[in-house]
């Protein structure tokens, strides 16, 4: 294979200007290939190439080494230079192209590799099993599903789609492009999936919020006696955290200790996150304190854990410990701190942390940080300040920011502002049923029934759908899910009879169903009461009372914010039945014990 002399001379003239500034001594060196390993910058690499040209070295292996250096830690300059070298070759081979593809897959504009890929295909160079992983990774990074599908078809034509290197990257490409079902089709075609393939599919499910499928596949993997590795554990732990599956999480912890995975900081951090999200804060603290080395992610996980459990002071003290040990905070650290302040009404402390994040640590606020600030202000009743904060943001506000404020308007019964906020939301997204429900509840609370009916019609015309309330509880290693309304029409099961009896006992202790929560003008109070009774969290708690020994903590995970009526009922349940109830909703944790909640009724 020959390299174009004219192109190399062009490179040389560009590189020669750097010679006098270089730290590389080439005077007594005979083999420039050996110099590449000593190279520290693109500038020095250019000088080595200049020396090689002066020495009449036109070896393809030398140029391949130059390209490898450029693509190892790609920048715009290094990839531009590598491409110049590649295109200067009269007969590049697939090995050198693979090096280019690896570089582009790590680059800010990964899809630039495809113009080069088309060129080599036109030259009759066929991709191999090392080509597809890099190209598919580029598609995954760029969320380029169509290009990924074309690569999948090409890999099938070449008989490489079931290759051990290609399969996992195909699965990853599809899941990163949010086509999890296609990823599963790829997985199911593998005759004997290896650990790497299982990891790719389990990770894909976990990242796309499909934890049940992730855990099901993990159990299948165990049934085939395949040993999970660090990547497996990280994905399974995140799935346990999403579901609130504490029993399985504890088993994973035992497995990690037995097989020495607890030496990995990432595994410990995932364990902290899992235990905290499953409601076992003490276990999370225990893991953290036993860690020999704690990085930013570990500290942040603990700060977030305390915040979500309403332990604002401990969250802030953890931050002080972190700084005293010279660990640099990141954006997650400050999300935890802002949430800690928000959940406990510490407005001024929250403002201070937000200011510090920008001015002292140089962290650019993300939409999540702005959302935390809106939550901080509005939850404390500073609704107009929150509205002004959103209006003056340096970026375009998203519906999420306005929705945070709308929820606070409901909590503080501010109908006028809620109407203004709803208009801003509907300008951006009018398909979210929950927005209509919140506004409708406010109208009902203020006896404006004509507006309730009108809004329900608008919601129907726009085909806006409300996400149904869903609560889950783990009993004997099985996660059981309940949806609001289950059993309203035919409450004949043992569970529903037990729920009816439980509500009777609650009423004897002073429980009064908050029928103002049910927005149906044509319903009488008894019908509204039945609707409240079959909220998903009440069903899950009742299931826990029926199926766990006396004294066992009942742990429930809900996909929405817990309503006021269920919150009041849970407090009484903890008192009457002597059970601690840990409820994780979309906002935070509620620890109910002896008739009280850890949130202090501030949520």
UniProtKB/Swiss-Prot annotation:
InterPro entries with a match to the protein in the record: DYW_dom (IPR032867), E_motif (IPR046848), Pentatricopeptide_rpt (IPR002885), PPR_At4g14850-like_plant (IPR046960), TPR-like_helical_dom_sf (IPR011990)
GO molecular function, one term: RNA binding
GO biological process, one term: mRNA processing
Location(s) in or outside the cell: Plastid, Chloroplast
PPR repeats by residue range: 93-127, 128-162, 163-193, 194-228, 229-263, 264-294, 295-329, 330-365, 366-400, 432-466
Pfam families assigned to the protein according to its UniProt record, in alphabetical order: DYW_deaminase (PF14432), E_motif (PF20431), PPR (PF01535), PPR_2 (PF13041)
Disulfide bonds: none
Region named Type E motif: 401-476
Transit peptide start and end: 1-38
Gene Ontology terms: cellular component: chloroplast
Region (Type E(+) motif): 477-507
Primary location class: plastid
PROSITE patterns with a match to the protein in the record: PPR
Type DYW motif: annotated span: 508-603
Record key words, sorted: Chloroplast, mRNA processing, Plastid, Repeat, Transit peptide
Deletion phenotype: No visible phenotype under normal growth conditions.
NCBIfam families noted in UniProt: PPR (TIGR00756)
PANTHER family: DYW DOMAIN-CONTAINING PROTEIN, PENTATRICOPEPTIDE REPEAT-CONTAINING PROTEIN
Family: Belongs to the PPR family. PCMP-H subfamily.
Function: Involved in RNA editing event in chloroplasts. Required for the editing of a single site in ndhD transcript, which is a plastid-encoded subunits of the chloroplast NAD(P)H dehydrogenase (NDH) complex. Not essential for the activity of the NDH complex of the photosynthetic electron transport chain.
Protein name as catalogued: Pentatricopeptide repeat-containing protein At2g02980, chloroplastic
Naturally occurring in which organism (per UniProt): Arabidopsis thaliana (Mouse-ear cress)
Gene: PCMP-H26
């Amino acid at each position: 294979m020959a390299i174009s002399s004219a192109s190399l001379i062009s490179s040389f003239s560009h590189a020669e200007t750097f010679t006098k500034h270089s730290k590389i001594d080439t005077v007594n060196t005979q083999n420039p290939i050996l110099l590449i390993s000593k190279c520290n910058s693109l500038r020095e690499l250019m000088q080595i190439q200049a020396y090689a040209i002066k020495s009449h070295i036109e070896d393809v292996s030398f140029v391949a080494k130059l390209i490898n250096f450029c693509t190892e830690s790609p920048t715009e300059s290094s990839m531009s230079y590598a491409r110049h070298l590649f295109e200067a070759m009269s007969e590049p081979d697939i090995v050198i192209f693979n090096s280019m593809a690896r570089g582009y897959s790590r680059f800010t504009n990964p899809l630039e590799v495809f113009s080069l890929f088309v060129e080599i295909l036109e030259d009759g160079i066929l991709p191999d099993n090392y080509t597809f992983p890099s190209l598919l990774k580029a598609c995954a990074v760029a969320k380029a599903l169509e290009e990924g599908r074309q690569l999948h078809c090409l890999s099938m034509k070449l008989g490489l789609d079931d290759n051990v290197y290609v399969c996992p990257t195909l699965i990853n490409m599809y899941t990163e492009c949010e086509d999890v079902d296609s990823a599963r089709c790829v997985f199911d075609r593998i005759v004997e999936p290896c650990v790497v393939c299982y990891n790719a599919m389990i990770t894909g499910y976990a990242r796309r919020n499909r934890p049940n499928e992730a855990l099901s596949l993990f159990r299948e993997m165990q049934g085939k006696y395949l040993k999970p590795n660090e990547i497996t554990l990280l994905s399974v732990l995140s799935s346990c955290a999403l579901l609130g599956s504490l029993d399985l999480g504890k088993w994973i912890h035992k497995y990690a200790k037995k097989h020495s995975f607890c030496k990995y900081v990432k595994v410990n951090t995932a364990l902290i996150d899992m235990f905290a999200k499953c409601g076992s804060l003490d276990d999370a603290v225990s893991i953290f304190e036993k860690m020999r080395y704690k990085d930013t992610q570990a500290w942040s996980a603990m700060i977030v854990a305390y915040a979500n459990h309403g332990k604002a002071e401990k969250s802030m003290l953890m931050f002080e410990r972190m700084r005293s040990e010279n660990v640099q905070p990141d954006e997650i650290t400050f999300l935890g701190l802002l949430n800690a302040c928000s959940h406990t009404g510490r407005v001024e402390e929250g403002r201070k942390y937000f200011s510090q994040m920008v001015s002292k640590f140089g962290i650019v606020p993300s939409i999540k940080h702005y959302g935390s600030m809106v939550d901080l202000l509005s939850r404390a009743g500073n609704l107009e300040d929150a509205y002004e904060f959103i209006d003056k943001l340096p970026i375009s506000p998203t519906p999420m920011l306005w929705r945070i404020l709308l929820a606070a308007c409901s909590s503080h019964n501010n109908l006028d502002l809620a109407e203004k906020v709803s208009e801003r939301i509907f300008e951006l997204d009018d398909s979210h049923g929950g927005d209509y429900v919140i506004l409708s509840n406010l109208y009902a609370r203020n006896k404006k029934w004509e507006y309730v009916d009108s809004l329900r019609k608008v919601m129907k015309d726009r085909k806006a759908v409300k996400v149904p309330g869903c609560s889950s509880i783990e009993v004997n290693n099985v996660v059981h899910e309940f949806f609001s309304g289950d059993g309203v029409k035919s409450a004949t099961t043992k569970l529903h009879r037990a729920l009816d009896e439980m509500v009777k006992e609650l009423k004897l202790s002073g429980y009064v169903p908050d029928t103002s929560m049910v927005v149906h003008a044509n319903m009488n109070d008894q019908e509204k009461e039945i609707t409240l009774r079959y909220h998903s969290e009440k069903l899950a708690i009742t299931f826990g009372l029926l199926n766990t020994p006396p004294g066992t903590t009942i742990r429930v995970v809900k996909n929405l914010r817990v309503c006021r009526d269920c919150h009041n009922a849970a407090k009484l349940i903890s008192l009457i039945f002597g059970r601690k109830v840990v409820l994780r909703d979309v906002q935070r944790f509620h620890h109910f014990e002896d008739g009280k909640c850890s949130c202090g009724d501030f949520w």
